[in-house]
Amino acid sequence: MGLLGAAIVAGLAAVGGAIAVAIIVKSTIEGVTRQPELKGTLQTLMFIGVPLAEAVPIIAIVMGFLIMGNA
């Protein structure tokens, strides 16, 4: 059961991270097309937001490894 739980955690974390990054990039592109003069600011915010969105899946994958280690 532990290996299955670890696989589910890793899979859901990867999907969640991909969706979060896609939403952040989509919103940044929409913002730049509406207001091109804010490109630098929006790009900076995107470069801050993407690692924050990826931190949660990385933590979840580490938790999956911990679950796998205890199995």
UniProtKB/Swiss-Prot annotation:
Give the transmembrane ranges.
5-25, 47-67
Compartments annotated for it: namely: Cell membrane
Q: Which UniProt keywords apply?
A: ATP synthesis, Cell membrane, CF(0), Hydrogen ion transport, Ion transport, Lipid-binding, Membrane, Transmembrane, Transmembrane helix, Transport
Is rRNA-binding one of the keywords? Answer: no
What membrane topology is annotated for this entry?
Answer: Multi-pass membrane protein
Q: Which GO terms describe its cellular component?
A: plasma membrane; proton-transporting ATP synthase complex; proton-transporting two-sector ATPase complex, proton-transporting domain
Report the sequence similarity comment from the record. Belongs to the ATPase C chain family.
HAMAP family, alphabetized: ATP_synth_c_bact (MF_01396)
Q: What name does this protein carry?
A: ATP synthase subunit c
Q: What does the organism's lineage look like at the top?
A: Bacteria, Bacillati, Bacillota, Bacilli, Bacillales
